Amino acid sequence: MSTANVRVIVRVRPKSLRELSKSAEDLLSVDSHNKTVTITPPKHGLKHSRHKNRVNGPRTFAFDECFAPSAPESKNLSGQEDVYESTGPLLVKSILEGFNSCFITYGQKGTGKTYSVVGLRGQPGIIPHISESIFEEIDKLKKKSPNTTITVSISLAEIIEETPYDLLQPNVNSSHTPGETVFVQKDSLTGYHLHGLSEFEVGSAQEIDAFLRLAAKNIRTELSDISGVRKGHSVFSLVVQQRIIDPKTRHSLKKASRLQIIDLASFSKGSQRNESISSFESSSNNKSLSVLNRVIAALTSKKNDVLIPYKDSVLTTLLQDALGGNCRTIMLTCVSPCDFDDTFSALRYSEAARRIKNISNINCKEAYSTNNEGELDDILTTLESDREQLRRHEEHSQKLLKFIEEIRNDYEERIHALESQNSALKAHLRLAVDAYLNPLEFNFDDKNVKLKEFGSPNIAYKQELNSFQGELSSLFKDLKLVKSQLHDYPKPEVSDIDMDMESLRHDSLLD
């Protein structure tokens, strides 16, 4: 067990061509010896700054390492090699010892986060350097301990709008389907990770590079905001499993450790959106970055009853070990030398993150005899898999039962409505058929109204017509005027009614 704070490194990018052309003011001063960065308010003041009530003058922040902008002509300024030397060896050593490790990049758009992680041709970043170093160290361990078996596997993902996407799945860009199986899960040895991703065993740095190229093609670049800022967080996960066999006792010890390199999504400049809203603190721009800042603030708060909002986003759920858990963590904060608001916020949160304490342990299983170890591992793996499948089946069953109940209620309502319509149509049909088979004719030759019936008598109609005999006499004159209309009134066709009923039955099958 070891206790250590999150290690925070700040890297200042050089001025951009646009900043140089505008002679933008340099607001940062880097003291690499004392490991501090001082930010000075711009000459035009802080009238429109969101930090105007927080800053009165130059402010100095202390970190574990500080790198000034790199320049080819100066050997004193940092480059990719310097950044790796201050981070990579510690990560490689930790993961091979069995400790979980995490490397996080943090900062605004265009400050060099992805460049620091991946690099360019001839200027490799953290991942290519670590890939080379880790296999070199594995070769040394195998030569030193021939009875040690070591495997390395990797996975790559991108978290976009609270949804993890597998970057090593074929055709991921065309389907745009995240897959229901990818979610954050805690493993008994390697801690919180994205479960359900494609995981591939690799044997060299070249193989890792090939998978990185595949992932780069699958990154969903269309999901970015209007300023071109990519909303996704890239997650590179490397798992090292070691099986160390004691040649005397034939007992073995299994170690498992996970290195996660997380390139956080960029946040756009506050001045390009709304100067009164912080690009760090506004959840409307990127919910997960906002939650991350709240987690950092809660972990470093002096209050004891503060709730840590890990569960408020997928990103912070994944980072539970990295921030305050079983992990050795390094944060690389990349900042701009000319932007006051976002640079000040980045430095402020990064200095706070440096106070977060992690307690890390070597991840190992109890030793078993090699004769039984494989069988026990298989049983444990099967049980874990069965438990997970049972949990997912229960969730699916609940959703299915709810869906079936909704469908049942909907169809009961439809059946009731159709039965009502059917009863009305039957009544209509009976009246129409009866009127067709038993037509009535009134003889108005004299003043006494007489009823003539054709066909077989209908007793019900007789009784009803007799009750209205007096009224019919008083309406003699009116009925005489419409006599001709009664003779011309069309008789309902039974075939037409049958057709309407059949049409209604077919319509109900489509529901």
From Swiss-Prot:
- Subcellular locations according to the entry: Cytoplasm, Cytoskeleton
User: Which intervals hold domain Kinesin motor?
Assistant: 5-356
Which residues carry the post-translational modification Phosphoserine, per the record? 278-279, 284, 456
SUPFAM superfamilies linked to this entry? P-loop containing nucleoside triphosphate hydrolases
Q: What is its main location?
A: cytoplasm
Q: Which domain of life is it from?
A: Eukaryota
Any idea which UniProt keywords this protein has? ATP-binding, Coiled coil, Cytoplasm, Cytoskeleton, Microtubule, Motor protein, Nucleotide-binding, Phosphoprotein
InterPro entries, from UniProt? Kinesin-like_fam, Kinesin_motor_dom, Kinesin_motor_dom_sf, P-loop_NTPase
Entry keyword Phosphoprotein: yes
**Example GO BP:** microtubule-based movement
Where would one find coiled-coil regions in this protein?
A: 373-489
- Annotated protein name in UniProt: Kinesin-like protein 8
Organism ancestry: Eukaryota, Fungi, Dikarya, Ascomycota, Taphrinomycotina
